[in-house]
Amino acid sequence: MGADEYTANAFARTNYVFTPFYIADGLQTALSPLGDIWAYNGVYYYIRLCNTFLEHIGDVYNLRAGELENWSAEIKALKAFYYFELMKRYGPFVLVPKNIDIYAPIEEQRQLRSPMDSCVQAITNLLDEAIPYLTPLREKDASRREFFSKEGAMGLKARVLLYAASPLFNGGISPYKDMKNKSGVDLFSKEDKEKWRIAAEYADEVIDYLEARGYKLISGTNSESTPLLNTMRDLELSLWAPNFQNSTEAIMIVSGASDLYQYVLPRLGTKSTDPHYSGVLYGVLGTNIRMINKFYTANGLPISEDKTWVHGDGYGMAQERDVMYTNVIPLGTDVLALHLDREPRFYATIAAPGLYWQRGSGSSNRLLVDSRRGQLFGLTEDRIDPRIRQNITGYYVKKGTRSDFRTQEYFTEINKFKQGATVYMRLAELYLIAAEAWNEYEGPNGAHRDQIFNRLNAVRERAGLPTVQVSWGEYGINPNKFNEQVGLRDIIHREKTIEFMFEGHRFWDVRRWGTAIAEGWNDKPLAWVVLGETWQEFFNNGQGPVVVWDDAYFNPARDYLFPIKSEEAMISGIVQNPGW
């Protein structure tokens, strides 16, 4: 939410503890940092618990064979995870290989931030020590599934190595290049291209390990009435592993069920007698035109790069008559042209005004997303009111919700179905890690060209798209784009954005790439006139989207890394991040 994917009103910020929105608004502060995990009772508290466990587990006399090694490995992986959470937010952090006695002299307790390379090495060392002794997920006892598995630790290491190779952490981007700790040691080393090779080779190793054990992208649904609906169902299922099981794609699953659906799904009515009403759903989180435009056309290209796109800016009305879109788009009916001829991930991820949204089985639960004021998905009020629940964009987010649970029973059904498991990492991410790292290391025409395109195209093909070569070669304005390193970088970045939209990646990806300004993070979010009572009014009479939230600010001189709480920096003596 601190990126630009979700858009919400003031009520969501002040009533639902969605503090990351304030980061996107430009309201981060060193006095009381938003999203702070450094200070007291933060991650260092849990790292201390990990150290305590590792220091004393050997004193337990009645462990069964293998438990010492396995349990120690699980905690080492957990400690590595906590270290990585610090790295993502703050860059170089303070390493704690062993606990410091609380009665130690103050100078011993005042530890320096370690150089970035040392931090990465500490994380990967912990994972290397853990992985040989971790149990594969499918072999774990039911009572141990919520602890780190071999696949999860391997996937985490692949992600860590990718971040370590990325511009923010690999040499640093301005203003971090010359950052030093209090003893004058450089915290960021010079850029090292070999880090991309290390990340790429390890990603390939993990993929080979996973595929040899039956992991694959979820695909092959044939229970729906059209190929498009089958593909949409595949994409929906890729995020689910109820009770830590029944997924060929989930490689890291964490304990705990997210309640985000309560704020994403609309209430659908005002009283319990309304046929689709649910009083525990709020629908305050929408999305915006920037995200809508990120999705490809049906040809697998950005709208601006598809020479066959016939809808101009997309802000006029048009009709769909192709039966392949049955039960997705109302056929023969005026809808916004921007919503036509788009890729399956658009229809699987976004509930767009004027299109259908399956909210339970059967045709009676196939609902038209009518976001005009006074309609089922629209506002009932005659003004935007910061004191109440409102969707201020007209768009809803399907990602991470189930189309087979009726709105009325969603709360009960989803809590029963998930059984405390949330997918944290998918095989698709490993494919894109490998593609990105090999492209950065040697470009698209090196020795690993096949790996790059095989990995990238596997994700696209599951999503119902042509290969990169076919999309750009046959339909693209620049048919040679994928043969250039910069062009392929843009393709891979966009693929990552689309495939993992609303899964918590974009906030960190844009930072590690150093592309926040190019991505428009200083531009206010745009969407539609949700007070409009006709489609013409709603879509602003064809004049394009309007500003729906007035705050958006990113300062590249400070905002790529979080501030350490100023009080913490003063007491501990550590150097503060630049700009804070």
Please tell me what each predicted stretch does:
Residues M1-Y16, F93, E151, L161-E381, ...:
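An aromatic- and glycine-enriched ligand-binding surface/loop that stacks and positions planar moieties
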Residues A10-Y90, I106-K150, Y315, V335-L340, ...:
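Conserved, well-structured interaction surfaces
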Residues V43-Y46, A122-T124, L162-A164, K182, ...:
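Long, intrinsically disordered, low-complexity segments
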Residues Y61-S72, E194, E442-Q451:
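Structural helix-adjacent loops and short alpha-helical linkers that scaffold large soluble proteins
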Residues E85, R89, Y163, N170, ...:
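Alpha-helix C-terminal capping/termination sites
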Residues M324-R462:
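C-terminal substrate/ligand-recognition segments
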